[in-house]
């Protein structure tokens, strides 16, 4: 097995090389903080002989599965170390993976360490899934799909170059210079464009998965400063 990144492997099966995506988790992308650590962690976990349990094929044609190293589930081990997040739609093992993520966050392991991406970042901020799944077909109500950032601090929160993301590898919103939330203030983020108040993501498709998702707020260096998960 050869490591491609923190949640992907290249596997030789009887002379046929296939790309494998670890099921139920998502590690930081190659250009994001903690990506190198996650890749090294996966490399260590599969250093000895590993067993692949195939469960699906993704939209890119990659095999999706669970990887076992002895009695250890590698997918879960990465989450337990804070080197990947648990996906809400991780199917039958989602509850166990989510529990592993909760433990990693509680103990500030890996990507959940306030100093994971350089100098320690402390921000008194919370995320609220205000309306992740509004009524009517999703593409018709992007302006009603809302996540809210709440400043619990006693001073202004400057969000310049902060990033709001979901569980996926693609949805990222970087805040423009001058985006500030006052003490005790709230900022609504809609998935559509041109909201009357707050900030518009201006996405052409829904951001938040109706079957459950997580929102993460990252400081400019990539440190996670707020996280919220919801289930339908």
Q: How should each PLM-predicted stretch be described?
A:
Residues 1-232:
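Small beta-barrel nucleic-acid-binding modules, primarily SNase/OB-fold domains
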């Amino acid at each position: 097995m050869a490591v491609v990144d923190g949640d992907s492997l290249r596997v030789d099966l009887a002379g046929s090389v296939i790309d494998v995506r670890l099921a139920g988790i998502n590690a930081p992308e190659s250009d994001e903080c903690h990506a190198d650590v996650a890749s090294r962690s996966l490399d260590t976990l599969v250093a000895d002989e590993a067993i692949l349990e195939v469960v699906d094929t993704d939209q890119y044609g990659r095999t999706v599965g669970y990887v076992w190293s002895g009695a250890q589930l590698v997918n879960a081990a990465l989450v337990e170390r804070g080197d990947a997040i648990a996906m809400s739609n991780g199917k039958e093992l989602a509850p166990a993976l989510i529990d592993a993520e909760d433990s990693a966050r509680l103990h500030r392991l890996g990507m959940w360490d306030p100093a994971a991406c350089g100098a320690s970042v402390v921000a008194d901020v919370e995320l609220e899934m205000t309306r992740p799944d509004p009524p009517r077909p999703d593409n018709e109500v992007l302006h009603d799909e809302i996540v809210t950032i709440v400043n619990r601090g006693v001073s202004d929160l400057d969000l310049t170059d902060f990033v709001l993301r979901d569980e996926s590898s693609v949805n990222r919103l970087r805040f423009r210079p001058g985006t500030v939330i006052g003490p005790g203030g709230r900022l609504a983020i809609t998935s559509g464009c041109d909201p009357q108040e707050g900030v518009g993501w201006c996405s052409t498709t829904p951001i938040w998965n109706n079957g459950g998702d997580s929102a993460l707020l990252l400081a400019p260096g990539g440190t996670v400063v707020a996280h919220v998960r919801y289930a339908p």
